């Protein structure tokens, strides 16, 4: 938004933005793209990857086949990318880089959402401790660095440093040392690019608000319960006053739309204020500064209240816990079966060394969709 209230239609990059012409490069040297920027190329490679397509059949909260309207990792990633791009334009940073990070942030997620990730991590640590655990941010980086097989001259997607860095939201010191330059910020305690910060916050905006929508559609949470949540209650009351005859379903959609807008407007204003205070003149200045993207204290409290409500009432609902328990059993039994007899694996996933074998099994399971994991489990454990 300009000072006169007009909407920014073209994004002229600010001095603190990541400039695609000054990227820190790719792992494997390539000629520059002819009709795209480097960050556009990254975004396009992510969209065309096999891992991105598989997100359509991976869980957000509900198992993929539970309902046609529930969000999957793919629809969630698209929603994150839309929010992230809006934020990037408002702050005059690279929309293409922000979008690429947003689209790639869940590429390493297992089937069955966080339940699958937690169980796969437990299996790796208990049954193959020498191989290290499993963490979906690291797996997302592994997907784009190694596991995708689309190009003749290299494994992975060969993305720019800035995109790879943005994908890696969390990392232990041990893993950071193994990753080289892309892990350095976890050792020297610096920040990622502003584009990465925005993509991370866009993820939070998307999943909190859209999980409200899915939770209501499923019947696991109710409008009455949500009246306890300040940001929802306030906007729902405003909608009811303005549109007293509106059907509950549409009133809920209007409420969620307003909640998202509140978060985006606050995030934009707060981030711009921090940028003015710290006056970064370059992308490197952003890295040396404290986090520049963020919510105001008041809106952060409201967002945290909503997050806690969802944790207590949706993610811990007995029906979700039942799905979680089934998912954990499927992941654990698949891992145990493959580790006990690697001949059950497709040939491409068989390895000579035990440590390598465990990692290959985790790659195989992490790459499964919900329904593929269910079918694979049935093939191994059911007669007929």
Curated annotation (Swiss-Prot):
One of its GO terms (biological process) is dGTP catabolic process. It holds the Pfam family HD_assoc. One of its GO terms (molecular function) is dGTPase activity. Gene3D superfamilies: Hypothetical protein af1432. CDD domains: HDc. InterPro entries: dGTPase (IPR006261), dGTPase-like (IPR050135), dNTPase_2 (IPR023023), HD/PDEase_dom (IPR003607), HD_domain (IPR006674), PHydrolase_assoc_dom (IPR026875). Residues 73-208 form the HD domain. Residues 28-42 have a biased composition (Basic and acidic residues). Residues 13-42 are annotated as: Disordered. Keywords: Hydrolase. HAMAP family: dGTPase_type2 (MF_01212). Belongs to the dGTPase family. Type 2 subfamily. This is Deoxyguanosinetriphosphate triphosphohydrolase-like protein. It comes from Bordetella pertussis (strain Tohama I / ATCC BAA-589 / NCTC 13251).
């Amino acid at each position: 938004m300009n000072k006169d209230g007009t909407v920014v239609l073209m994004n002229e990059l600010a001095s603190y933005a990541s400039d695609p012409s000054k990227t820190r490069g790719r792992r494997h040297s390539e000629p520059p793209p002819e009709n795209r920027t480097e960050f556009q190329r990254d975004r396009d490679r992510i969209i065309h990857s096999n891992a991105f397509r598989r997100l359509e059949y991976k869980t957000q909260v509900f198992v993929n086949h539970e309902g046609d309207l529930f969000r999957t990792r793919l629809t969630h990633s698209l929603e994150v990318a839309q929010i992230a791009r809006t934020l990037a334009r408002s702050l005059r940073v690279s929309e293409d880089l922000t979008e690429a990070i947003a689209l790639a942030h869940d590429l390493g997620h297992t089937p069955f959402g966080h339940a699958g990730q937690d169980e796969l991590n437990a299996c790796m640590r208990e049954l193959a401790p020498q191989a290290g655990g499993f963490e979906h941010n690291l797996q997302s980086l592994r997907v784009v660095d190694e596991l995708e097989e689309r190009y003749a001259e290299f494994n992975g997607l060969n993305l720019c440093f800035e995109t790879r860095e943005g994908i890696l939201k969390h990392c232990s010191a041990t893993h950071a040392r193994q990753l080289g330059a892309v892990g350095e910020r976890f050792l020297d305690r610096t920040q990622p690019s502003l584009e990465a910060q925005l993509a991370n916050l866009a993820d939070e905006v998307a999943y909190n608000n859209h999980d409200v929508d899915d939770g209501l559609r499923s019947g696991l949470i109710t409008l009455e319960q949500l009246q306890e949540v300040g940001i929802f209650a306030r906007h729902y009351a405003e909608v009811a006053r303005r549109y007293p005859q509106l059907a509950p379903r549409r009133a809920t959609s209007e409420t969620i739309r307003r909640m998202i807008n509140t978060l985006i407007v606050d995030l934009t204003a707060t981030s711009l204020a921090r940028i003015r205070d710290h006056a970064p003149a370059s992308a490197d200045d952003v890295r040396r500064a404290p986090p520049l993207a963020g919510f105001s204290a008041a809106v952060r409290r409201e967002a945290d209240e909503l997050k806690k409500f969802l944790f207590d009432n949706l993610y811990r609902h007995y029906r979700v816990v039942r799905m979680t328990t089934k998912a954990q059993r499927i992941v654990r039994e698949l891992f145990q079966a493959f580790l006990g007899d690697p001949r059950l694996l497709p040939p491409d996933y068989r390895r000579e060394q035990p440590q390598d074998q465990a990692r290959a099994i985790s790659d195989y399971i992490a790459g499964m969709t919900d329904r593929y994991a269910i079918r694979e489990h049935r093939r191994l454990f059911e007669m007929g």
